[in-house]
UniProtKB/Swiss-Prot annotation:
Organism encoding this protein: Streptococcus thermophilus (strain ATCC BAA-250 / LMG 18311)
Protein name in the entry: S-adenosylmethionine:tRNA ribosyltransferase-isomerase
The EC number(s) this enzyme carries: 2.4.99.17
InterPro entries: QueA (IPR003699), QueA_dom1 (IPR042118), QueA_dom2 (IPR042119), QueA_sf (IPR036100)
Organism lineage string: Bacteria, Bacillati, Bacillota, Bacilli, Lactobacillales
Cellular location(s): Cytoplasm
Reactions catalysed: 7-aminomethyl-7-carbaguanosine(34) in tRNA + S-adenosyl-L-methionine = epoxyqueuosine(34) in tRNA + adenine + L-methionine + 2 H(+)
Domain of life: Bacteria
Length: 347
C-alpha cells in the first residue's frame, strides 16, 4: 500500500478555523459501506443512527494548556515548550524551540519565575526531558500560564479555550482534543441516553503524533506514536453486556476505536479493565474485533486517520465520501464537520 493511495485534493478554505457557535449544528455525513449510500444531515440527528441497547463510547481525556512561552534565565532568549507527556513526578517530555540552545542544565523561566524548568536530557527532533519547579499545584500554574496547543493548520486565535474541550472532558493529559467528541452537547447526550443507549467513557491521552504526517511511501513502514489509555472494569462490563445482548459498540472518534481495538486484541474480542500504551496502526486489511460503528471528523490527506476509516469502510468508498463532502462544502479537520460510519456486517 502506498501513502499516495490515501491522498485527495482539499481546498484550503474548507479547513475550519473556528468552531461553530452551536456544537451540534455541524453537518453529518452518514455513510453505509454495504449499500454505498451517503446521507447529508446535521449532527444533532446522530441520535437517529443509534438504537436502544447500543453503547456510545467516548474519550473523556482533557486537553492541557500545554504550550508555554518563556525565556532562558542566562541569555533571556525566547523559548517555547510544548508539553508532550508526564514521565514521572515533575519531569515532562517537551518539544522545545529553539532546541539547539537548550542543552542539559539549561534553565527556562515562565511567568516571571512562577514556573521554571531545567533540561535534564536531550532527545531527538527537538525533544527534551525537563524538570519543573513551582509553588502550589502544577496544573493550576499551567492553567494560568499555558495556552491551548491548537493544531498547526488552525491559524485563528481561539476566543474560548473550552471550545477545544469536549463537554465531558475530565482526565487531564492530552496535547490535542479528541475532536469527534466536540460536536456533543449535554442536551444531546441526555436525549441519546433517554433513547436507551448506554453512555460509556474511556481515556486515551492524545499525543502530537496524531498530526504527524506519514513520511514514508510504503504505509507498512510507518511507525505509530504511543499513547496512554485506560478502561475501567465498569466500562468493560457494560460493553461486554451490550455485545452479548446484540447491541452495537459505537465509538466516538479514532482514539476510542484504537483503545477498544487494542484491548479487544489482547483479550480475544472481550473487554477487560486495562491501561497501558498503545501504538496500534489500523489500516486496510485490519479485522475489527470490537467496534461496530463510529463517528469521526474529516481528516488530513495521507494521514493514518484516513487509513483507519478506510480499514473500516473501504478505501475507494471513503475517498468517494470525501469527494462528496468537498463538493458539498463540508468543513474539515478539528473544528470541522463529522461523518458517521456503519460497519459492513454479514449478520
Amino acid at each position: 500500500m502506498n501513502t499516495n493511495d490515501f491522498d485527495f485534493e482539499l481546498p484550503e478554505e474548507l479547513i475550519a478555523q473556528t468552531p461553530l457557535e452551536q456544537r451540534d449544528a455541524s453537518k453529518l455525513l452518514v455513510i453505509d459501506p454495504v449499500t454505498r449510500e451517503m446521507t447529508d444531515t446535521h449532527f444533532d440527528h446522530i441520535i437517529d443512527q443509534l438504537n436502544p441497547g447500543d453503547a456510545l463510547v467516548m474519550n473523556n481525556t482533557r486537553v492541557l494548556p500545554a504550550r508555554l512561552y518563556g525565556e532562558k534565565t542566562d541569555t533571556h532568549g525566547h523559548v517555547e515548550f510544548l508539553l508532550l507527556k508526564n514521565t514521572q513526578g515533575d519531569q515532562w517530555e517537551v518539544l522545545a524551540k529553539p532546541a539547539k540552545r537548550l542543552k542539559v542544565g539549561a534553565k527556562v523561566s515562565f511567568g516571571d519565575g512562577r514556573l521554571t524548568a531545567t533540561v535534564t536530557e536531550e532527545l531527538d527532533h527537538g525533544g527534551r526531558i525537563v524538570e519543573f519547579s513551582y509553588n502550589g499545584i502544577f496544573l493550576e500554574v499551567l492553567e494560568s500560564l499555558g495556552e491551548m496547543p491548537l493544531p498547526p493548520y488552525i491559524h485563528e486565535k481561539l476566543e474560548d479555550r473550552d471550545r477545544y474541550q469536549t463537554v465531558y472532558a475530565k482526565e487531564n493529559g492530552s496535547a490535542a482534543a479528541p475532536t469527534a467528541g466536540l460536536h456533543f452537547t449535554p442536551e444531546l447526550l441526555q436525549k441519546i441516553e433517554a433513547k436507551g443507549v448506554k453512555l460509556v467513557y474511556l481515556t486515551l491521552h492524545v499525543g502530537l503524533g496524531t498530526f504527524r504526517p506519514v513520511s514514508v511511501d510504503n504505509v507498512d513502514e510507518h511507525e505509530m506514536h504511543s499513547e496512554f489509555y485506560t478502561l475501567s472494569q465498569e466500562a468493560a462490563d457494560t460493553l461486554n453486556s451490550v455485545k452479548a445482548a446484540g447491541g452495537r459498540i459505537v465509538a466516538v472518534g479514532t482514539t476510542s476505536i484504537r483503545t477498544l481495538e487494542t484491548i479487544g486484541n489482547k483479550y480475544d474480542g472481550q473487554l477487560q479493565a486495562d491501561s497501558g500504551w498503545t501504538n496500534i496502526f489500523i489500516k486496510p486489511g485490519y479485522q475489527f474485533t470490537v467496534v461496530d460503528a463510529f463517528s469521526t471528523n474529516f481528516h488530513l490527506p495521507k494521514s493514518t486517520l484516513v487509513m483507519l476509516v478506510s480499514a473500516f469502510a473501504g478505501r475507494e468508498f471513503v475517498l468517494e465520501a470525501y469527494k462528496h463532502a468537498i463538493q458539498e462544502r463540508y468543513r474539515f479537520f478539528s473544528f470541522g464537520d463529522a461523518m458517521f460510519v456503519t460497519r459492513p456486517s454479514e449478520k
